[in-house]
């Protein structure tokens, strides 16, 4: 008996709970529609569309629910789904002509002007209003513009094609056909911004493609130097996580951008040589960037290149300009005006003639080859482009002094050495010239004095630096007036004085009489 009670108790409880609580209630169609209406009003279009779908399952003949679901679909941009719902409405209730008008509007935006005209005619058979007349006019304009755009494309009239396809797209902005037509014509014109905008719209209209996001990421990174490149690659990988082309582009851009960020950080911190180290070399940032840019201009797997040749990628690449400008700045700030720095700065100037660092580099290099007036113009250009920066003013003043100096004494020319000659070369040149300048061998005291004056300046590190900066230590009108012969920090290889006697110190004497210069090796 006790066992029977233990078994019976759960059964009794279940029976009581069913009587008390009842079966789980199932919402009625009216309740579902009421909830869907609330969601639609709140802007929760996806949830509203699902709710209307549930109501339609309960009552497939209620065309009002199709209409409201179509409204939700339109708000979500699901135009094809909305078209299907409006078509279903007409099957249920052919007299509901408003569905024809809605289909006409959708088809017009899709660029299907002929079908839109058909739907609009079905609407105006029973009802005509100003909105329908306006739509009819727009469809006529759109059809004519599309026809003209196609004709212009066939004749290679790219600008005309762009103008007419633009007019047609004003009526049918969601038309992939018209959008691609304008892309083709704008590409021929090299209009990168228009192409980028249209490709972005096409990618949103067809998110299942991988080529468009790849093309967009390459344009965004190489041409526009935009952070949007990463977003486009994510779209590509979102659709196909295993896509090899998407992974390859992602890896390349990530590697380049990582090193570019390091270069920017080094330049900002003043460690210019470290920045140059990353930029330079066969595996340096600039070489890898140029290779990646070149790859983007080549067709792949039977598809067009990501960057059309009409874009002139090397000339118009903002990222290329940014990287070469960084390289130019690093070389200028490191006072590196050799061939490498010159190449970087000249490339920068070829893309942007208003880059300040490239003009500084050109000016400094012109100074080194003694083209004083050209150098003066270059550094003055940099000064003006910089907004008369006080950081550049010393370079202008230096060029001015050197230009003035060039019209006076040139100690390097006196010794016959280049401006970058080292101490040993200067001493050797002086000794050689002194043998020829001595009065006993056809020279003169004036020539010998000029040699001594030149050597005194160029053999002294401090005096030479002043002279190289345009301040002649022997010029009484210079910035620092003093007698450069008051000290011999650089060391004269000869000490001379007026006396009779031979020309000593060389392995062989020079015959002759009269006043002699006596030289003694240091």
Swiss-Prot record:
Signal sequence, start to end: 1-22
GO terms for MF: misfolded protein binding; protein-folding chaperone binding
One cellular component term from this protein's GO annotations in UniProt: endoplasmic reticulum lumen
PROSITE patterns: DNAJ_2 (PS50076), TPR (PS50005), TPR_REGION (PS50293)
Alphabetical keyword list: Chaperone, Endoplasmic reticulum, Repeat, Signal, TPR repeat, Virulence
Region entry Disordered, spans: 465-494
SUPFAM superfamilies xref list: Chaperone J-domain, TPR-like
Compartments where located: Endoplasmic reticulum lumen
First and last residues of every TPR repeat: 29-62, 63-96, 97-130, 142-175, 210-243, 256-289, 356-389
Pfam families, per the entry: DnaJ (PF00226), TPR_1 (PF00515)
Highest taxon, organism lineage: Eukaryota
Entry's Gene Ontology BP terms: protein folding in endoplasmic reticulum
SMART domains, A to Z: DnaJ, TPR
Predominant place of localization: endoplasmic reticulum
Domain-related comment: The TPR repeats mediate interaction with unfolded polypeptides and the J-domain is essential to stimulate the ATPase activity of the chaperone and to increase its substrate affinity during the folding cycle.
Name of the protein this chain belongs to: Tetratricopeptide repeat and J domain-containing co-chaperone DNJ1
Taxonomic source organism: Cryptococcus neoformans var. grubii serotype A (strain H99 / ATCC 208821 / CBS 10515 / FGSC 9487)
